[in-house]
């Protein structure tokens, strides 16, 4: 079975390959045929054909394809822009061009656009102030008549009442009746009024102002219906009634009485304000509807806000103060306030401080309106009690402090009257305390100011100041044990300033202790500040000695942090000074080789000793490394000269300081021990150009070491050496104005001239190093 399947598969594969090969051969033949046809067509163009054959043949159209050429790019020339040569148009021409189109075509056969345009025009005319008003239509008059007939009969007035209203409006000069009668050519007769208000015969013949005066309830708020005539002076007075939305004006019948009552209130409030009484300013008042007047539309408030009177005009006398209190109660019955009646008086310290015989007091306290009358008796009792206690305090040598504030008003925190004032744990002077808040600005007469003592509603203060009597003239500070002390403007800690006040002492007492006037035996202690105490350190004293070192000894700048010693080499070489030959140390090797010398400065810290006077200069106090006899005070600033032998070995006596033999000399020894190969490798590492000979390389390194001193030459790696040399060289150039100006002006620098300038300052650098510096900083150089 398997063999049959295998044979079938092999036959299918064979037939498929045959079909594929036949298909490929057919495709190849087809492609060759097409290629031949194309070639023949191309060759037919070269075939010679006679005229007869041309007539018999139908030649195919020949299409000629032209090669597109690129347009030559035109060179754009830069030229000035030509101005606009058009003639400026006048405003009339601009308007004519803007309205060239026919605007009436917009409204043609379109009623909606016409209505929209007319509506917009009517809205814009409503806001105008012209006196020409539109007439009320017949439908609107019918609506007014129907609305009036629907009102109750109680609100209808008689002919006499209407006449009185018209007369009152003419006399007062306000009201809508004057608007209706503003046209002198039109006047209302009895028939017009009867038709307008629909009055019957009984109402026309009645003598009373109202048809039902006795039946009307005074508490009822039924309104009177008033309408406008055809002549309206303002667009706001025009009655625009539509079919679905109609309006009418309801005026309260008690407007006249309310306006009159409001005028009375204003006159009374003006009278009380002139007398110096304060009327509280209400934040919100009752406002009613607005009434329209004749030419100028005026707004009249039914209840106007009383004017505010400053606190400095408060309480001129007792009678006026009582009268003011009654007026405030009367206003409170009529005016409904939406804010709590809390009034805080801000006192002026300059005008309200009263000069009393003994101590003066000023209480910084909030004032509430409801405590003005209740605390008057407490004020007088407090003053009497205070005078008695002040007499007793004279025997104990204590008096209350005079607390004077500056001209800035003191604003107390806003608290409600229901809240009790916070009681401070610190006792006030001589027990003059009131549990309730006390007004500060209350006065009996303008000439006399009553000062009240009360607690300050604020956080308890840890310090209380009390002024003593003139016998002791000392100011004491009382504070509690549980509270810390802080430096204030009155208390003085640290370095006291020169003031006219008495010195400050501190008395310790516990909370709730007896009064300060009774506790006269309190302990006096020093003031302890809450800030960290800064320890005082003894000032360091440094002594500087200047020496002249000559011969072969080379001294470098050196710092010894352990012994606080600094050696500094001063400037360039100086000419030798002529010194006494007796003080000169002879040279052991060559006494003639002493042409060169240098000046060094040695600075050392002075250890102060208490047993000696600082003004005296003794040998024990001297910190000079080279003690060449004692110096007088006049010769301290002079330079002491010391000539040493030309040998490298130097003994400086018994000073015990060997800093001159330290790492500075050891570094030179380490460099000298290096071989030529090692020096050449070091030169390559530092970016320097190696030279022939070990001595020459040592000379170059010695010059660089002196130039970058006190930097260690062996500790520098890579480009650090070049950077140190360049930084030092740049610093020297900036210090010399001549060279700095030449470099800033890009003047070519001669390297040899720069080298000579450095040699004059005892700096020895090679030309290669200077050239590398100039190339690095883009400085132009020349060899000529």
Swiss-Prot record:
What does its PTM field state?
A: Phosphorylated in response to DNA damage.
Query: Which ranges are annotated Basic residues under compositional bias?
Result: 73-89
What keywords appear on the UniProt entry?
DNA damage, DNA recombination, DNA repair, Nucleus, Phosphoprotein
Does Nucleus count among this protein's keywords? yes
**GO CC aspect terms:** Slx1-Slx4 complex
InterPro entries, from UniProt?
Slx4_ascomycetes, Structure-sp_endonuc_su_Slx4
The identity of this protein, by name, is: Structure-specific endonuclease subunit SLX4
Q: Tell me the organism.
A: Candida dubliniensis (strain CD36 / ATCC MYA-646 / CBS 7987 / NCPF 3949 / NRRL Y-17841) (Yeast)
Q: What is the lineage of its organism?
A: Eukaryota, Fungi, Dikarya, Ascomycota, Saccharomycotina
- Gene encoding the protein: SLX4
